Regions:
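Blade-level signature of beta-propeller repeat domains, shared across WD40, Kelch, NHL, RCC1
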Residues: 342, 346-351, 355-357, 361-385
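A short beta-strand motif characteristic of beta-propeller blades
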Residues: 72-80, 117-124, 167-176, 216-223, ...
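Short loop/turn segments immediately following the C-termini of beta-strands
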Residues: 51, 102, 145-148, 158, ...
Length: 385
């Protein structure tokens, strides 16, 4: 695997980062915690990117008893776009929503009632962005994009007042004898590691300096040409990485995270998900994991055991919308949200059974005026925990 980095990065900077990385990592699976920034905007809002109607829909989540809740459209929803949304991320302050297209990242301010307002002059040009994430300290937005031969991660510094983005660093990597299909990027809760799923190109791990925004490529996981790594989740302790994989050897694969981001697959991995896992998410406690299977429109649920191993939950898999594509947890930790590109419904919300812990119970759903709306992504506000 060859590595090409943005011009202007000096050798001395790399040496300094290597020393810093050694200080940040200790024994296997241990990382110095990165203190998350507390949210400024309160409220429990979720946003859905619709690729057929070229819009973003916002909903307020109202808590009810187990199995009951409401999703109410926020004022001005849906917001019509002049482009097709490709990915979304919310700032750690919950003040800004970032929405990418094939050529740019656009910034919207989030009102106290969840409404969205475009912010003039704060967007940036960015090519083929497929996934974004914001660092736990709230300083950085990272985007994943690229081509079939080159994956690229851009690092942007976030202006806390305006949400404006300033490009500070770029990391590029190619994978020998593989076709890269950039899928998902996730920053670890520790803030020091960045993971990127590259479809049939496997996965790549970067060390990340949260002071300077510098990336340093550390490891690549190769897969066969008939395998695609699509989604990622990292547990709260930055101890285990969960990969949603489809094709040959499909399922949820679990890797122990070691020193410097080194990965080693745990025993019994992969864990069954119907062979076509597209995305994966952990609940707020880290005790349960959920994987979306686009092929059969279901969500597989698991209890997370010691060492990160998974055991199927009672009633799993659970029915969802057609071609369920994206999962997230609301900022209270009480609900799982699922967006389905095939609709029927476009957005589903589940509560967690108290009698059978972890089991999903349908709580609310939304079928939009145009169904399917192509609801590919759902993002929820941060809890600040």
């Amino acid at each position: 695997m060859s590595k090409r980095w943005a011009a202007g990065v000096q050798q001395l900077a790399w040496m300094a980062f290597a020393v810093a990385a050694m200080a940040l990592t200790g024994c296997d699976g241990f990382f110095v915690p990165n203190v998350p920034v507390p949210p400024v905007t309160t409220g429990n809002y979720v946003y859905v990117a619709n690729t057929v109607t070229n819009s973003v829909s916002g909903y307020a989540v109202a808590t009810g008893t187990t199995g009951t809740a409401t999703l109410t459209a926020v004022p001005g929803s849906p917001v019509s776009l002049q482009y097709t949304p490709v990915a979304m991320a919310i700032s750690r302050s919950n003040k800004f929503l970032y929405v990418s297209s094939v050529g740019s990242i656009n910034v919207y301010s989030i009102g106290s009632n969840g409404s969205l307002t475009a912010t003039n002059g704060t967007g940036v040009t960015a090519i083929n962005v497929t996934s974004m994430d914001v660092s736990p300290d709230g300083q950085w937005l990272l985007s994943l994009g690229g081509t079939s031969v080159l994956a690229q991660i851009n690092v942007y510094q976030i202006n806390a007042s305006t949400g404006a983005l300033t490009l500070t660093n770029t990391g590029q990597t190619s994978v020998a004898n593989a076709v890269i299909v950039p899928r998902m990027l996730r920053i670890s809760p520790s803030g020091t590691l960045v993971f990127a799923a590259l479809g049939t190109g496997g996965d790549v791990v970067f060390n990340f300096d949260t002071t300077t925004g510098t990336l340093f490529n550390s490891q690549n996981l190769a897969v066969s040409a008939t395998t695609s790594d699509n989604g990622l989740a990292v547990d709260n302790a930055t101890a285990n990485l969960y990969i949603a994989r489809s094709g040959t050897g499909g399922g949820v694969r679990v890797f122990r995270i070691g020193t410097g981001g080194s990965l080693s697959e745990i025993a019994r991995s992969p864990f069954a998900s119907g062979g076509q896992a597209y995305t994966v998410v952990l609940d707020s406690t880290g005790k349960y994991a959920y994987a979306a299977n686009r092929a059969n429109s279901t969500i597989y649920g698991y209890a997370v055991g010691t060492g990160g191993g998974l055991t199927a939950l009672d009633g799993s898999p659970y029915g969802s919308g057609l071609q369920v594509s994206s999962l997230d947890i609301d900022n209270t930790g009480a609900y799982l949200l699922a967006a389905a590109s095939g609709g029927k419904p476009d957005l589903s919300m589940y509560s967690f059974d108290t009698t059978t812990p972890g089991m999903l119970i349908p709580a609310a759903s939304v079928t939009m005026g145009t169904d399917p709306a192509g609801s590919m992504f759902v993002v929820a506000m941060h809890s600040g925990q």
